[in-house]
A protein has these predicted regions:
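Secondary-structure boundary elements
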Residues: 4-108
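Long, hydrophobic/aromatic-enriched structural stretches that serve as scaffold segments
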Residues: 73, 77-80, 111-119, 123
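Hydrophobic/aromatic-rich core segments of domains that either
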Residues: 114-161
Length: 161
C-alpha cells in the first residue's frame, strides 16, 4: 500500500467517525439523576428459581461468585446459533424450555444474555442485557452480553459463548 492510499483510507475513516460524532452531540447529556430499580419479587422469578434450582446452582458467597456459577452452569448447556430467528418469547422461562440441553435448538447471544440476566435477577443479583453495537457503516454485526451490577465493585460484563 502506498502512502497516498494509506492517507486516503484514513481520511475516509476520519470523515465517517466525524459524522458519527456530529450526529450524536447530545448523547449522554442527561442530568445524571436516572435511578434504576429492580423488583426481585415478581412471580416469574419465583417460578424460574424453583424449576431450575437457581439458588442451589448459584450457591452462597459474593454476588460475583454466584453470578459466575450461574454463567458456568448455563453457558455449556445452551447452544449458540447466529441463525436463530427469535420466534420463542424473549424470557428465560420460555427460552430455557426451548433450548436448555437441546443442541438442535440453538439461540443467539441476545437470548442467552436474557436467560443469564433473568436467572441472576431471580436469585437477587442486579443484572441487565447490554447491546454492543459497532458504529460503522461497514459493520452490521452486534453482540449482546449480560451486565451484572456488583455493589462493591464496578459493573461486570458476563458473556456466554
Amino acid at each position: 500500500m502506498t502512502k497516498k492510499e494509506w492517507n486516503e483510507i484514513h481520511q475516509e475513516k476520519l470523515r465517517i467517525y466525524s459524522g458519527i460524532l456530529f450526529h450524536n452531540q447530545t448523547f449522554g447529556s442527561g442530568n445524571g439523576e436516572t435511578v434504576i430499580c429492580y423488583d426481585f419479587s415478581c412471580p416469574e422469578f419465583t417460578r424460574l428459581r424453583e424449576k431450575y434450582r437457581l439458588e442451589e446452582i448459584a450457591g452462597t458467597g459474593t454476588d460475583f461468585a454466584r453470578a459466575k456459577r450461574l454463567m458456568h452452569y448455563l453457558a455449556p448447556r445452551l447452544h449458540h446459533s447466529s441463525w436463530y430467528d427469535n420466534h420463542v418469547p424473549c424470557n428465560a422461562w420460555d427460552l430455557l424450555a426451548y433450548s436448555l440441553d437441546n443442541p438442535e435448538q440453538g439461540i443467539n447471544c441476545l437470548n442467552k444474555a436474557k436467560i443469564l440476566a433473568e436467572c441472576c435477577l431471580a436469585v437477587g443479583i442486579s443484572a441487565r442485557r447490554v447491546s454492543i453495537m459497532p458504529y460503522s457503516p461497514y459493520d452490521f454485526d452486534n453482540h449482546v452480553v449480560t451486565e451484572v451490577w456488583l455493589c462493591a465493585v464496578r459493573p461486570l460484563f458476563c458473556c456466554m459463548k
